[in-house]
Amino acid sequence: MGSPTHFGLFLISDAEREVHMEELKSQEASKSKPPSKPKSNFTTFSHGTPDLSKIHKVGMLATVCRTQGYFVLGGGPIIEITGVSNDHDNNNSNLVEITESKNDTSDSTTTTTTTPSTSITPITTPVVPQIPTSKYLKVSIEPHEYSELGDSLTVRALRLQLVKCIYSAINRYQDSSFAQHLKQICMLPIFKMDDSSLLNSIGPLCISSPSEYQKLLECKSLEEKLNMVLSMLVKKCEVFDFNFSIEKQLEEKTMAQQKKYFLTEQMKLIRKELGIDLDEKETIKNKFNSRWKEIAVMDKQILQVFKEEMDKLSSCESNSSEYNTSRNYLDWMTLLPWNVYTNDNFDISKVKEILDRDHYGLKDIKEMIQTFIAVGKLRGSIGGKVILLVGPPGTGKTSVGKSIANALGRQFHRISVGGLSDVSEIKGHRRTYVASMPGKIIQALKTVKTSNPVILIDEIDKISRSSQGDPNSALLEVLDPQQNKNFVDYYLDVPYDLSRVLFICTANDADSIPAPLLDRMEVMTLNGYIQSEQMEIAKRYLLPLVRKETGISEEQLQFTPEAIKKLCELYCREAGVRNLKKFIDKIFRKMAYKLSMGMEQSVIITPDNLEQYVGPIKYPSSRLFQKQKPGIVMGLGGSLIHIESALDRFTNGPTVTTTGSLGLVMRESIDISYSYVKDFLLKVDASNDYFLKNSIHIHAPDGSTQKDISSAGITIVSSLLSLATGKLVKPDLAMVGEVSLTGKVIGVSGIVEKIVLAKRESIKTIIIPKENKKQLEEIPDFIKEGIEIYLVDYYSDVYSIAFTNDSTIKPLIFNDNKENQNENENQSEVKSTIIQ
């Protein structure tokens, strides 16, 4: 066929385009390597003879022109396919050949239809593609003429405006390919003489989608087409302007940064030459040296490490990672208070005054602090010590630590270790890691700027183990007086003296602390508060504190003693007073709302209107069973424990069923008690074979609470005996103690807390093991007042006390003592705490 001079360009339909794009995606996905040859502007189809239904009928007859040694495909007239021609009509000049792909020859690649991308641009190529002779489809075409003439005034004005925009774009965007294409089109002869060719050449450069281009091709109004091309050209120019503005801003910003950098470097060099200023490295070195001289460390090992790090800092480049590591290390080294100590307060009377002002009671803790200061006064300096405060939540353990620091005149720092599982939090991270830093102990010393502070390690019983190590083992070095004089943090890697630090640890349960760690502490117990103590705490501390926080005066809101008693008795039975403060806060908040709304001017809280402010009663009764029944006995643990035994009528044989969220220890205690009670019942009544014939169900109410104690042995035996004999245990009687298979009553731990619990629950008679007699001396007299305490050695003693009236054991009765009572009033023997 030779080299063609015209090409008929038709867009494929939208549906065909989607199918074709899916094929291209699948081909690209199947290729393992990118194509070695660049993609051409023609797309090859292998679908056989084209189907006219898959292409648009209106297209363009492009003209191949030669300019400046290149072949350029320029826009030509718009044509429309009218139908398929017969094979014999070969001489018709209005026929266009649509070729078919033929794969039977090795050098033939047939192009049937051109698929434009988002914009159709003039194609510049040194060689015009040759279309091989093959099977083809002839179609009839005719010009797609405009419906109106192009000589109107509007058309002329639009044509002039379009030409002005073209030349403006060429001048403004000279370096862009868009301007180069416009420039090549302007050089063609058709640019100056044919409006249609001009529009058909400019339009493809400005389109944004194939549908927009097809709409441009099918337009029959010259005026409308001029408007479309002109608007597309203006939009194209706006996009270029926006891109150029962004590029200009980036260029200006980059130039400004470079200029600032060069000027800064020049200024540094000039100041250095004039001796006005030193460089950054010299400034930092001078700062570290001046700090180190003020510290005056005498340890040779520490001095050697400091010198080596300073030499390393001098040899490193300022932008290297080693430089930053050395600088951070030296910063920590020079900020620690190596030889800084605060002066301790040796005035014992003043210390006692501060402790009594902040806390009432706590006799053992106050005596320990006073003796601690007395020893330091004789020595001339107060050394370190490790104290463990054990008690229920809300009893003021943290506030005690703050009061001790205030009394001694030392700095105070609190470290919370609850849930801690990484040893590095205690001993620091090694410097090989990124963003490494010292542990919490060294950080605390840097914060307080002294080497003898009071450090409170809070919730030490809640430390956990993990794959990162055991923090409890790391604390051994911190808290051991023989080791903490040379405590080595992994980050510092030099010894630091912690021997003069007063460590105060807090815990709710000392049993969960490892024995080696517990052995290094002096354990002080803070028991729970009874009702009278809670009332005093509310009057003396909580009410004034909440008044200050809310701004409500005493004239606006008052409390009667009966209301405070009801609040403590029916709403706040916890061992601490934190929950009591929450209820008082709630009352004051509701009162503040009423004052702000003008609903009330002043209110007096009484037992009658208390529920309006705090809601329904939380604890309607302190006892689960108001009426005593056989098989029910009351025991003491962390709270009141009722052991309930009943006959299981629907189970055959002598069996025992247990319920109530019982732990392994308590289940073993039930087994021991059941084995013993069968033998003991035969001794009491040989004819009673109750346990040999019947099945028993033992239950501990409040099943949502886990129970795992060994101190309920005598309680379980008494419950089973009460069921078997039908006898009732004396009212207001609670018992605690572990029983053996021979009936021996074994001592238990936490007897002080259990007596306090009994006092809080208004229990009048208590049975405890004889082995726990010494622990009674630790309980203040005002707590033991009004309670009968029986000391028993064997269960036979328990039986005679609980079920008969012929017991030979006399109770320990703590009656009112005027002398002690006056002393208590003078010394205010009521434990209290500041809620913070």
From Swiss-Prot:
Signal peptide: none annotated. InterPro entries: AAA+_ATPase (IPR003593), ATPase_AAA_core (IPR003959), Lon_bac/euk-typ (IPR004815), Lon_lid (IPR054594), Lon_proteolytic (IPR008269), Lon_Prtase (IPR027065), Lon_prtase_N (IPR003111), Lonm_euk (IPR027503). GO terms for molecular function: ATP binding; ATP hydrolysis activity; ATP-dependent peptidase activity; sequence-specific DNA binding; serine-type endopeptidase activity; single-stranded DNA binding. CDD domains: RecA-like_Lon (cd19500). Residues 106-122 have a biased composition (Low complexity). One of its GO terms (cellular component) is mitochondrial matrix. It is found in: Mitochondrion matrix. GO terms for biological process: cellular response to oxidative stress; chaperone-mediated protein complex assembly; mitochondrion organization; oxidation-dependent protein catabolic process; protein quality control for misfolded or incompletely synthesized proteins. Residues 627-805 form the Lon proteolytic domain. Belongs to the peptidase S16 family. This is Lon protease homolog, mitochondrial 2. It comes from Dictyostelium discoideum (Social amoeba).
